[in-house]
Amino acid sequence: MKRQRFKFKLLAFFLFALFALLGTYGMHSIALYGNRWFTYAKNPRVRAQKQNVVPGDILDRSGVVLATSSVSEDGTVTRVYQSDEAARRAVVHLLGDSDGQVANGVESFQTAYLYGFQTGIWERIQALVTGQKRHGDNVTLTVDSSLCTAILQSFQRRASGKSGAAVVMNYKTGEVLGMVSLPTFDPMSSSAVSASSNAYWNRVTQNPYTPGSTFKLVTAAAQLRVNPSAQTMQVNCTGNLTVDGQVIHDYGSASHGAIDLKTAFMRSCNNAFAQYALSMGDKALREAAESFGFNDNFLFRDLVVENSVYPTTSRSNFNIAMSGFGQSAITATPMHLCLLAAAVANKGVMMEPVLIDRVASPSGVTRYTRSSRVYRTAMTERQAAILAEYMRAVVTSGTGTRAAVSGMIICGKTGSAETSLNGRAITNGLFIGFAQNVPYALCVVVEDIDDGQGGGSTAAPIARDIFAYLKNMQ
């Protein structure tokens, strides 16, 4: 009898532990993925709420109303955006649109606030008594809408007709100040957009690009980590390198001769970085990439960002060599590439990107205020200082001179990434960088650049325009 009671107790304990484990896992999953599940377009609770609530306003950091609602006499709610078309187009991807064509914009990802799911019971009762539609909360963003418009205008001036992306953030706080994706569209007439144009796609957060030579920042960090003599060691660049029977060329078949890490970084020497990758091995390079967030599952509070990839299979010597300068199967979004530059600027510390500054009820009661959070420490402060020096040399004497702004200490890295689009070989131009005298980092991508061009001639001038605008904001 005692033995039987013991078995029952053991079974009860096992079941209790199992339910506790399931409960803990459930709460953990809700904490991580809850908002993503909640904002799913077919959530019946959300769809029902949208019929009975006037969505709150969305404002930029200066109080400019980016989206508001108009209610007709028959109770029909219409979402209204800024009167200036260029301003509407500049922020459409970060906001989203009322038709739900843009995935994971503020309009959808902040549904819980905009449609009043956080509203208290007394506010709900008041709305029922008066018979009026309840109003959702107002969301203030960290972005500067004028900066977004300036970025769009720079693209139109310097890369007319090109697709691309740009993002700007405060590297000390993680605040996203600007985010623009091209092609863009007018949210007031989104039904006229051709599906084939990919205009609904937010390239900043949803489009993982081949990073090209911007990834040399990670390779250089790996060298500094594993090789005590990395700064002084020289490798020989002959203009081409044969690995596994395949030839790796430098841009224009340039031959740099004996070259150290700083000069190789400044001149963006592919041969040198292929040799660095081969000498340190795939494991060391992958670990460095993962310290910067590659192969991570990005679960940021305010943004849905596509994961970045450092490949873990099919790692031939040729693929490892190509990885050294950001080719092979490595991919990263412009948002993540911006975080790489931001980590260097912030002494090795990568901040979580944040987009929501404040949420307030229609009566002004604060529901939420922004808080900064460290995402990860990518490298030591000393390593970050060395890389900052290298990135400064890129802008003063290397491939990124067109990003220079008088009166600002700009550091950066250019990239020209070979990839394909609809089966056609193309090259994308990239620039990542930051300013040392003001806390801003950025990433610019220009897609399908012309033959003979690179990130230094396409993306860097747009970065220069952005930095110049930021300088005048101070």
Regions found by a protein language model. Give the residues of each.
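Beta-lactam-recognizing serine transpeptidase/beta-lactamase-like catalytic domain environment
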Residues: 62, 126-127, 172-212, 218-448, ...
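Active-site scaffold segments
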Residues: 216, 338, 460, 464
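Periplasmic/cell-envelope proteins involved in peptidoglycan metabolism and beta-lactam response
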Residues: 1-192, 199, 208, 233, ...
